[in-house]
Swiss-Prot record:
Keywords: Antiviral defense, Cell membrane, DNA-directed RNA polymerase, Immunity, Innate immunity, Membrane, Nucleus, Transcription. One of its GO terms (molecular function) is calcitonin gene-related peptide receptor activity. The keyword Cell membrane applies. It comes from Homo sapiens. This is DNA-directed RNA polymerase III subunit RPC9. SMART domains: RPOL4c. InterPro entries: HRDC-like_sf, RNA_pol_Rpb4/RPC9_core, Rpb4/RPC9, Rpb4/RPC9_sf, RPC9. Belongs to the eukaryotic RPC9 RNA polymerase subunit family. Its main location: nucleus. The gene is CRCP. It is found in: Nucleus; Cell membrane.
């Protein structure tokens, strides 16, 4: 694979999701059907990408959340690529953050990792299904502790 333009901007999963969703809506409104094989390929790529991306945390993000998140990360000395990974993947453990931040052992203390983790989990929305599972599991644990 060859890099055509190394200065191209990086896009978050949220931006790709919004772009493809808008493109899909425009096609519906214009009523254009699949005519050429190129158009069919584009439709397939759009469909598969939306299918994958809609299962990620970006589905619950908004421009305001992204802006707030990036502003909160200014105090951490992270590269653009690292910020993008944190935004796209919404890590919930210190290990996940250490995997996303290059040379994290040298660059970040445990306190900084915990602060970064708190920033990620407090600003970026969680998957509703994950929250429900978490609540269900904690209720089950409470029921097991209280045999009354």
């Amino acid at each position: 694979m060859e890099v055509k333009d190394a200065n191209s901007a990086l896009l978050s999963n949220y931006e790709v999701f919004q772009l493809l969703t808008d493109l899909k809506e425009q096609r519906k409104e214009s009523g254009k059907n699949k005519h050429s094989s190129g158009q069919q390929n584009l439709n397939t790529i759009t469909y598969e990408t939306l299918k994958y991306i809609s299962k990620t945390p970006c589905r619950h993000q908004s421009p305001e959340i992204v802006r707030e998140f990036l502003t909160a990360l200014k105090s951490h000395k992270l590269t653009k690529a690292e910020k993008l990974q944190l935004l796209n993947h919404r890590p919930v453990t210190a290990v996940e953050i250490q995997l996303m931040v290059e040379e994290s052992e040298e660059r970040l203390t445990e306190e900084q990792i915990e602060a970064l983790l708190h920033t990620v989990t407090s600003i970026l929305p969680a998957e509703p299904e994950a929250e429900q599972k978490k609540n269900t599991n904690s209720n089950v644990a409470m029921d097991e502790e209280d045999p009354a």
